[in-house]
Amino acid sequence: MKIVFMGSSTFAIPSLQVLKQAQYDVRAVYSQPPRKAGRGKNYKEVPLAEFALSEGFKVEQPKTFDDPNVVAVLKSYEPDFLVVVAY
């Protein structure tokens, strides 16, 4: 079963961990792009993307899904399911 996981906050991390531990075929993790944070307003990775990268997942962070190229990349993963948790 091919899965694309979508989320951004720390709330989504346990769900992704369960899928990994159950050895599901998570093709990619979609998350929101980095956000400006702190006093210096430097860009900071969103929690799920940071976790997914540390676990070796392919991470996509599109600004919008209105772009046909973004949709084409999503389709290229040929997912059977999209799992969305706190996107």
What would you call each of these model-derived segments?
Residues 1-87:
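One-carbon transfer enzymes
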